[in-house]
A protein has these predicted regions:
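Nucleotide-activated chemistry modules centered on ATP-dependent adenylation/adenylyltransferase
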Residues: 1-303
Length: 303
């Protein structure tokens, strides 16, 4: 008697992501996976485990470290990489500043976020990477929504939205010339809710700041920023302590928290399911510089 074989949404997304990772491992000589210790890159690393175990993950992981990251996330990054036995490459924005490759911003709105582009491109060149896995998703932001899964970057590391390759079904064009590379986004079709559902299903450990906790914050442009030594707080920005969590993590100078009491994965899932604002739209000050802030950065070589 025939039986129906049904795959859940997560099973379909997982299979697609694993296929993409195996395709890259087979077609490129020197791939790497961007791993910041955030929830999306944690899911990416879990998918890489599934794609290649019982063998070792056949590429290193890399983090572009601004030096202004949350301690909880950096500690998790180092511990997780050590547990898996993967090679962790840390590309430092501070090293780029010291070498005169970039100039640090000053003033109230200063951030190292944009400076990461130069550090990233230098690391790609130094390590001769020809493919780089990223954890970007189409539901995050409109520039990422129109980017291909296999995103071509020219010899300068730049992205041209008008020069994207057709992607038919699960067929990907991996051909590049010397000096060019491909940014690959295996979880491009996932949503924030899918990520959390997968974290729950796979029982993945994530940094504690993704759950509700008390933190001293101040409000700037509608965003709750953590009090820290890297941000110049104005006299009109009083500090207060409240219960928050982070939907996304990045540079402390431009990543905001959200008011929340969600202290478990199930509670976070319920909260995400009810929200009508994207995580970057609600919490990322770096995306508010202009209407096309993300696309402008990506054109220059950003993640």
């Amino acid at each position: 008697m025939p039986t129906d074989y049904l795959l859940s949404q997560l099973d379909v997304l997982e299979a697609e992501s694993i296929h993409i990772m195996r395709e890259v491992a087979a077609e490129f000589e020197r791939p790497a996976l961007l791993f910041s210790g955030g929830k999306d890159s944690i899911v990416m690393l879990a998918l890489a485990e599934k794609a290649f175990r019982p063998a070792n993950i056949p590429f290193p992981v890399m983090h572009v470290d601004t030096g202004h990251n949350f301690t909880e996330v950096i500690d998790f990054r180092d511990r997780r990489a050590a547990e898996l036995g993967v090679r962790l490459i840390v590309a430092s924005v501070q090293d780029s500043i010291d070498a005169g490759r970039v100039v640090e911003e000053s003033g109230r709105w200063a951030s190292r976020n944009k400076l990461q582009t130069t550090t990233l491109l230098d690391a790609i060149e130094d390590n001769r990477f020809d493919a780089l896995f990223g954890g970007a998703r189409r539901d995050e932001e409109k520039a990422r929504a129109k980017e291909r899964v296999f995103s071509f970057r020219d010899e300068f590391g730049q992205w041209d939205p008008k020069n994207q390759r057709p992607e038919l079904w699960n067929l990907y064009n991996t051909r590049i010339r010397r000096g060019e590379h491909i940014r690959v986004f295996p979880i491009s079709n996932w949503t924030e809710l899918d990520i959390w559902d997968y974290i729950e299903r796979e029982n993945l450990e994530i940094p504690s700041i993704y759950y509700a906790h008390e933190r001293e914050v101040f409000e700037r442009d509608g965003i709750l920023l953590a009090d820290n030594q890297f941000v110049q707080r104005g006299d009109d920005e009083p500090l207060f302590t409240t219960t928050v969590r982070y939907r996304t993590v990045g540079d402390m100078t431009c990543t905001g928290a959200v008011s929340s009491t969600a202290s478990t994965v199930a509670e976070v899932i319920a909260e995400v399911a009810a929200t009508r604002i994207t995580e970057r739209g609600q919490t990322r000050a770096d995306d508010r510089a202009s209407e096309a802030a993300m696309e402008d950065r990506k054109r220059e070589g950003y993640f």
